[in-house]
Amino acid sequence: MSASPVAFGAPKSPAARNRKRKPAPTMEAPRPRPALGKIALLVAGLGLGIVTALTVTAETSSQLSAPGGLFTFLGSLTGMIGTYLALIMVLLVSRIPVVERVAGQDGLVRLHRAVAPWPISLLAAHAVFLTLGYAAAARAGAWHEAGTLLTKYPDVLIAAVALGIMCLIGIISVRAIRLRMPRETWWLIHLWMYLALALAFPHEIVLGPSFVGHPLTQVVW
């Protein structure tokens, strides 16, 4: 009696192997969770309110009525809000899984693009308002005061470098310019935003009215 090849474990035909082969598992992006999105939006709005309140409560009526006081206040306000929004903007594209579960990667990218123009515009306004405010207080010209701020105030020069980096990132983000650049170059320059935020940090703590004399606020920020 001849032995059956199947009984002795002979190799199965390709067709038999294909019938039992299971597809390889695929990685799926985290699905958006609307409930988490609403909570995150509430937290972000609360943070914005706290930042605004810190700036407003740091000013007194006498400071506002002094020469250049209004410009200085507007400079502080735009600086604080602009920095907060810049941090939010970076967080949106940080690829942190917990963050991506809130709105999904595509939704976060759309939010990032919607938020992006605001921090750069506000921080540019911050520099202009403060220069005008300090110039009015010193009864000096704006250009002269700009030079004084850059050379005689601590950490302002590196903050100006940070603002320049942010403006460069804003320029290359314009669609007409972005499409003409190699994606690798565009992405590498975008990573400089982390450097810009780090460079801008010292002058906020040393000179910001919301931080000077407020150690708890410094630690939280």
Model regions: which residues?
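Membrane-embedded alpha-helical bundles that constitute the cytochrome b-like, heme-associated redox core
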Residues: 2-221
